[in-house]
Structure formats: C-alpha cells, structure tokens
C-alpha cells in the first residue's frame, strides 16, 4: 500500500529591498521544512503568498499589481510585508485577498497557510532543506539581517510605522547564522538592517554569547567576530554615528571589506533639518577625509534625495558642492516622491516635477563624471574580484568596491575557467562611469 500523499504547493512573489528578501527566505525555509513544495508558476500552486513593499508610491503600485496578478492567475492569495501594514488600502483594491499580515509576521503567515492548505504528513529528518535555509540569492553570497525596525523618524520615510522601532537580533543568533552560511559555501556576507550602526542600542549593547564566549551586542563587535569567518563582509545602511569611526581600522586591516554604504540624503543643513536627519556637512567632509587617510582603499556609497519640499536652487547647489568635495565612489539619487503617511507631505513649497527632473539630471551628470574619474584611477592596478556569472564569452564579477545589483561590475572577457564564488586577482585594463574590464593575473 502506498504512503504517497499530495505535496501541497505554494507560489511565492517577493518584492522590495534586501531586508524583504530575507523575510521571504525565512518564510520559504519554514514552508520547506514543513514539507510544502515551492513552485514558480501560479497555476501549479495551491496558494500564493505575496511579500509586498510599501516604501514609495511606485512600490505600492507594483505590490498592488502583483497581488492582482496572483488573484487573477490563482485566486487564493495571502499578502504580507510592508504594504500589509495598510490592510484597508489593499482591501479597497483587492477585497478577495484571503489574509493580510504586516512585515516580519512569519508565524501569522504560516498559520494562515496551515488554515487554507493544511500541512502535509512530513518527516523533518528526511527534509531536503539545507542547514542554512532557503536562499533567494546565488549560493556564494547572502544577506544577513541583524535587526528590524528603526528609531529614526525621517519625514520622507514611513518604515517605522510599518516595521516598528529598532529590535536587534541576539548577537549569538546572528553569528550562528553567519557560520551556517559560510559552512554552506557563502563567500560574501552582506550585513543589512534599517539602521546597521544602531545595532544593539535597544538592548543597551548588552553582552551576548557565541560558542560560550561573551560578545558585546554592537556593530563593531559584530564586525570583529564576522572577520574571523574568513569571507568578505560588506556593511550596508550605516548611519554616520560617531562610532562608525571605529570600524574604519578594521577595514584598513583587511578584516572586513573597505566599503561603507551611508545614506546621507542631502547636504543642505536646512533641508536635512526638514528631513529630521542628523548631519553637519563640514563635519561629514572632515570625517570622510579622515576615513580615507586611515583606509585609502575605502569605497563610499551613498543615496540622496533631490526635489525635497522646500529645496531651493541654493540648497541644491550645496548638494552639488558637497559631491564635488566628497568625491563619493558610488551614489544613488531619487527624485522626492510623496509617500502616504510621511510627514514631508505636509511641508510647504513642494517642488514642481519638472524642477525635480532637471535637478536629478544635473546631479547624475556630475556624479557620473566623478565616478568615471574614480574608476579611471584603478586602470593598471590589480584588484580582487568575486565571480558572479560565467558563460561562453567570459565571466562577470564584482570588486570589493561593488555590492550586488546596486553597484558596478568587473568584466573578464574570455575568462571561462572560473566558477561563481571564485575570488580571483585581476589587472584592470579599462573603465567607464560604472564598470571595469580586466584580465586574470
């Protein structure tokens, strides 16, 4: 007599930032552990989960469209993620959604799945789920989320209203996860959160334990511990608090990657105040100079907003002057977009769309020139490159200065004798505004 039973199948759509991706990985890991199959097609699935983003209006629209598509193609849909914090907004457009939960509501999502698609008979000891869990990234790099939520109340952002105040993960749990990832073949760990440099603030930097050893719950201690794993460690979403200075020597010593992703947002003191952002431009420029003196290889990435309510031509010019002085390596720029529930919506002197567009173009033109000059300095030098893709034409990878998906690439034309995850030494032969070309040494 056969014991084979139907294995329930779940479809999954993951939208938004790397932090959302980590939430998706956690839900998928739990589902696979319980014996559910995860399928890539709506019509094969018994139910679909949509993990949404709600950060800006375009993300809300994309999430609503994804929910609509899942409903049309399948009919049984559970919604989670940031937009899930605004249940009324979803129900107004899609009343047939079965259940809605907010972000990081893993247990609720699983309970809803159990209700509509009961758990299969399953022996967890025969599970094929890898020890590091289900990952949605290539196997040689992974995101490591160290905290949830944020204590800032920036006027352009609604993340705290969706994800709550800062909650740091126990440092022992974070380090154990990092060790599992490395044991599974991960060569690069990308540390993420809403506010990485605030890690441990909510628990007063209490002492945790890892492998029986006491470890302080702080960004610097975390970096010191991660450096012992022998893989690339990259820091994202680092607010420029004073103690950030303490990680620069670790970068200079080669313990973690010489890469800082610091969201500065603007350079006009008046606009920063309207944004409820900290920061003195002169102080920030002095720190950047000091950081580069300690760690000459340091790559600085940042993001900025142009066209924020009240931004004058004088304010914008301050931003351009800052770019010229700071000469940042990697920069993203967004035109201010009103987000429902954000305090900035109530500010006077909203900037016309055509002015936002014009300022964005001027900003990008200047930064492209700076980026091209910075990359040109690397021509003729030897750098380390982690390989991401290989085909018959060659390999594509990233240097220590490049995070996946948001930064540039290094092209190794004709280099086919490598595989994803390999770290190779490359001589840089050419550069443009964003990317490098070179040959393996």
Swiss-Prot record:
All residue ranges annotated as the TRAM domain in the record: 376-441
The cross-references to InterPro entries, in alphabetical order and at most eight, read: Elp3/MiaA/NifB-like_rSAM, Methylthiotransferase, Methylthiotransferase_CS, Methylthiotransferase_N, Methylthiotransferase_N_sf, NA-bd_OB-fold, Ribosomal_uS12_MeSTrfase_RimO, rSAM
Q: Which Gene3D superfamilies match?
A: Methylthiotransferase, N-terminal domain (3.40.50.12160), Nucleic acid-binding proteins (2.40.50.140), tm_1862 like domain (3.80.30.20)
GO CC entries: cytosol
EC number of the protein: 2.8.4.4
Domain Radical SAM core per the UniProt entry, residue ranges:
136-373
Q: Name one GO molecular function term.
A: aspartic acid methylthiotransferase activity
Q: Which cofactor does it need?
A: [4Fe-4S] cluster
Q: Which residues bind [4Fe-4S] cluster 2?
A: 150, 154, 157
Q: What does this protein do?
A: Catalyzes the methylthiolation of an aspartic acid residue of ribosomal protein uS12.
Question: What name has this protein been given in UniProt?
Answer: Ribosomal protein uS12 methylthiotransferase RimO
Q: Which organism is it from?
A: Salmonella typhimurium (strain LT2 / SGSC1412 / ATCC 700720)
Gene giving rise to this polypeptide: rimO
